[in-house]
Every structure is written in C-alpha cells, then in structure tokens.
Amino acid sequence: MNLHEYQAKALLQRYGVNVPRSQVAETAQAAVEAARALEGDAWVVKAQVHAGGRGKAGGVKLVRTLDEVQDIAVSLLGKRLVTYQNAPDGQPVEKVLVEATLPIARELYVSMLVDRSLERVVLVASAAGGMEIEEIAKDSPEKILQEVCDPLNGLVDYQARNIAFALGLVGDQVAAFTRLAKGLYRLFKENDLALLEINPLIVTAEGALVALDCKMSVDDNALYRRRELAEQRDWSQDDAKEAEAHNAGLNYIALNGNIGCMVNGAGLAMATMDLIKLHGGAPANFLDVGGGATATTVARAFKIILADPNVKAILVNIFGGIMRCDIIAEGIITAVKEVGIEIPVVVRLEGTNVELGRKMLSESGLSIISAAGLTDAAQQAVAAVKV
C-alpha cells in the first residue's frame, strides 16, 4: 500500500526527520490560503498521486506569486496526471501539497528497503540525489552505498557514520545524518514498510538535512496490525479492478495482455502466465482466487476480469485441493449466465471433484472449451485470441 507524499512526510516528522513547511489543499482557493499562511516569496505546488516522475509530467511546479499558485492548482486538481510510472490514463489528482521553498546546497539519495536475497533491511544512499536511482545503479553502480542492518542490532551508529562520510558530510552533519538514518530504520521496522525512499534528501545552505520528497510503501500483509496506516489508503489511486478484487478477498494485478487468467494459488498463477507467454500469448492479469473461494467469489472474479476491455479470452486453471472443482464449475456457470460472456473461456480442472466439475460444465449448455492439461489450455487460449 502506497502513501501520498504528505502522509509520508507526516510520518517522517514523528521520527525526527526534518521536512519542509507545507499544507495540503483540495481546492485552488485552499492552495492560495496555504501559500499565504506559509509566507515567503516562492512555493512548490505538488500533485499528490502514487507515481514517480511527477516533475517531468508537470505535476510539480515552482511558483512565485499567489496567482500562479491558483493557476497551477486549477490545472492539476480534478485532472488525471500521466507519468511514465502509472497507467496510460494516469491517476486522479484530488489534493496538492503546497510547500515552502528552501535554499539547496546539495541533493542526496537515501532509502530503506528489504533485500530479499540477503533477507535483511538495507540502508541505501548515494551522493547523486534528485535523479532516478535505477539509472544511477545501472550507469554508475559505484555511486550506490549500502549498509546491511542486522535484525537483532538494527542499524548501528558506525554504519550510519560510514554512509555519512562516504556522502561527503562533515561536522555536525555526520551526527545529524546518523540520527536521521536510525530514525528511518525505526520508522521502517515499526510501521512494517516495504519501501522508504527520500529523493532528494537535501543539505540546505545552512547545512541542515531536510527530506524534500518521500515515497513510502507499507507491506500489505501487515495492514491488519497497522490500522492507522490502512485507514489512509487512497483507493482512487489504485486500479479500479484491483480495488474491487481486494474488497472481494481476491489477489488481482492488472497486466497489459489480452488473455484473462483465473487460477487458484500464486505459484500456479505465475506458471500459467509463463505458459501463455511461452506459446505466444500475453496475460491480461494475475488473479488468485485462493483456496476458500465460493461460487459467488468466482463469479465476481469473472466480472473483474471482464471489466478489462482488452481481454479477448479467459483461461481458468484450477487444481482442486482445498478449492473443489465443482465449486469452480458452479461459479463459471453463474458468471457466464449473469455477465453474458461473449469471449472464449478455456477451462482446465484437476483435483478434488474434478469429474463432477467437468460434468457440470459439459451439461451446462454453455460454450466452454475444456482443456486436457495445462499446456493444452494455454495453447487453446492463445489460439482463441488469434481467431
């Protein structure tokens, strides 16, 4: 679950990290009042969307008059911002962050993330802040600094100081960075974050360290114990189908292909998508109905898949263990009747009550393609979209 910049900065402040003075606004007039309250002779107006690349897309603007604040707010609020990181139709801008400007001497990069190969939280930093870290890692990997955090001891002072010295910080800045880094580690651990990224972390003309921009992502699997954070979720930023799937207890991720997939089990779902690609097709989604789905849930899953206009065929791949094949068959029949599916549906069933499930499908009178195995199912689905 992603947080907006203003939400992330509020968390940073709780852990002693300096952020610019700012106010959130939902209307152009509120943006003007925010700038007036912040005072100064220049402000930055930032669109609040869950995507990077806002600056290049026109979502971050430096303004010097209150009239400009209003004009930029009007141009952003109620519109959709398209960046290289989000969907082709962009994401809605419902709020802007009006921020006081600061004199910048240097721009740094700092983040906390989970290195899955090491199974550790890692502090990552670079003196090349304000740039895309992926490009830095690719073109100049020597500029990426890392310290691996021990799960028992956490991030210790000497590790933070090592990074500070490598970044070229001096004097009081070293102690300030050490406090900041240890605060970030506590924030990361205590809030079950999956990613915490400050880019840039600036050094002001006075030598202070300030988080100018921040990205935070909370581990979805921990939201049950992070109620305060879960309540901050902005569903308008998520794919509508993904939001509906979440409410239905389904694991759904939209992709760019044209073959809809409904599978039980994440591993089997990924294997199914691999086979579709292997045989020349492109999956339109990842959808795991899990082991406890009902016929109603399966029908709802069909509706979510069909909400994607790019879907030209659907492949249902079920290995019945906890999930019984007759339940899946009932859901398929219900969905086809309710939604009026007019595209090919390829079904591969194996496992618990498979014969009953196949019988239900064959006697339903519906146009459903039965597959003998997973490879056959993938081949038939790919062939169906090419007709």
From Swiss-Prot:
Substrate binds at residues 264, 321-323. The keyword Ligase applies. Its EC number is 6.2.1.5. One of its GO terms (cellular component) is succinate-CoA ligase complex. Mg(2+) binds at residues 199, 213. Gene3D superfamilies: ATP-grasp fold, A domain (3.30.1490.20), ATP-grasp fold, B domain (3.30.470.20), Succinyl-CoA synthetase domains (3.40.50.261). Pfam families: ATP-grasp_2, Ligase_CoA. Transmembrane segments: none annotated. Keywords: ATP-binding, Ligase, Magnesium, Metal-binding, Nucleotide-binding, Tricarboxylic acid cycle. PROSITE patterns: ATP_GRASP (PS50975), SUCCINYL_COA_LIG_3 (PS01217). Pathway: Carbohydrate metabolism; tricarboxylic acid cycle; succinate from succinyl-CoA (ligase route): step 1/1. GO terms for molecular function: ATP binding; magnesium ion binding; succinate-CoA ligase (ADP-forming) activity; succinate-CoA ligase (GDP-forming) activity. It comes from the Bacteria. Belongs to the succinate/malate CoA ligase beta subunit family. This is Succinate--CoA ligase [ADP-forming] subunit beta. It comes from Methylobacillus flagellatus (strain ATCC 51484 / DSM 6875 / VKM B-1610 / KT). The lineage of its organism: Bacteria, Pseudomonadati, Pseudomonadota, Betaproteobacteria, Nitrosomonadales. The gene is sucC.
